[in-house]
Amino acid sequence: MTKIKLGLLYGGKSAEHQVSLQTALAAIKALNQDKFEIHPIYITEQGQWVRGERIEGEVTDVEALKMSGAENAISPLSLSTEIIPSAASEENAIDVIFPLLHGPNGEDGTVQGLLELMNIPYVGNGVLASSAGMDKVVMKNIFAEAGLKQAKYASFIRSAWEKNREEAYSKVEDKLGYPCFVKPANLGSSVGINKCKNREELEDAFVEAFQFDRKIIVEENIVGREVEVGVLGNDEPKCSVVGEIVPKKDFYDYKSKYIDGDTALIIPAEMTEEESNVIKRDAIIAFQSLDGAGLTRADFFLTKDGEVYINEVNTMPGFTPFSMFPLLWQHTGLPYPELIEELIRLAIERHEEKQKIKYTI
């Protein structure tokens, strides 16, 4: 059987660099090397691209994935010939890319656009869904147009805030009240997010969030259970069972997600069949409103009255040992190794479908 030459793309110039390394390590452990040739492609924290030797055997430490040596790093402008050759005749050709990148410069449509220009199959969402899914303000605007119920929100640009901070704080207090959540608009993994109960905490949260992005979003607090569902597919997506996150802290922050695992995951979540159906329905609506492909994880709040509010969609959920997405599919009957193989199949399917498009008149 001919092996699929799989390029694992990980690292990235992002605050979520370490998360990406953890995701890559988990994927490598799960991939069947009888079916796949694994070719690591590392993006350093400085944005340099390095292609390593084919992975054979076991990798046990994320540090082994940090390929060093500036002499081997190149500019993305040379990718098509030096890092990711896709011509079938080339010995180092790559059949499909699996981007395991999180945050800006990876999950936001930039890398997806590069791979589109190179006309190479890649796992996951395209340029539109990736960019819209990364920007919480754009995403919420799209969800509003799709008729999805969500928390009230307000967005702010750093330059305007610097000119009139009082106006920004007053807008939050008048429109949203306390408590509220302040978040960078273009970052995931709960980086830079703070829950604010008063003006002092709000001011501090604005300062921190603007360190990570030029645009931030502030959302009203919805009192409810945090539930999530996985979506898998292309034109006909399907949903996993619904899971629940029960953080021991005030909310599900970066440390709870990736460092100490100080959170309980309940899969499947206890709820009525009607509540589960509404969550799955809205997850599909969100996926299709973004023109999703491959996968998303949709996050919701479920109130004690049974009201469902969509929080956000993650277009590249993590695959770490604590990650909800693979666990949801495991409990749905799709084990992690098979999940990854299905994502690769979907990537190839989508690429073949796009080759049918006519570009000349």
From Swiss-Prot:
Signal peptide: none annotated. Its cofactor is Mg(2+); Mn(2+). Mg(2+) 1 binds at residues 299, 312. GO terms for cellular component: cytosol. The keyword Ligase applies. Binds 2 magnesium or manganese ions per subunit. GO terms for biological process: cell wall organization; peptidoglycan biosynthetic process; regulation of cell shape. It is found in: Cytoplasm. It is an enzyme of class 6 (ligase). One of its GO terms (molecular function) is metal ion binding. It comes from the Bacteria. Mg(2+) 2 binds at residues 312, 314. Residues 140-345 form the ATP-grasp domain. Pathway: Cell wall biogenesis; peptidoglycan biosynthesis. It catalyses: 2 D-alanine + ATP = D-alanyl-D-alanine + ADP + phosphate + H(+). Its EC number is 6.3.2.4. The keyword Cell membrane does not apply. Keywords: ATP-binding, Cell shape, Cell wall biogenesis/degradation, Cytoplasm, Ligase, Magnesium, Manganese, Metal-binding, Nucleotide-binding, Peptidoglycan synthesis. ATP binds at residues 173-228. Belongs to the D-alanine--D-alanine ligase family. This is D-alanine--D-alanine ligase B.
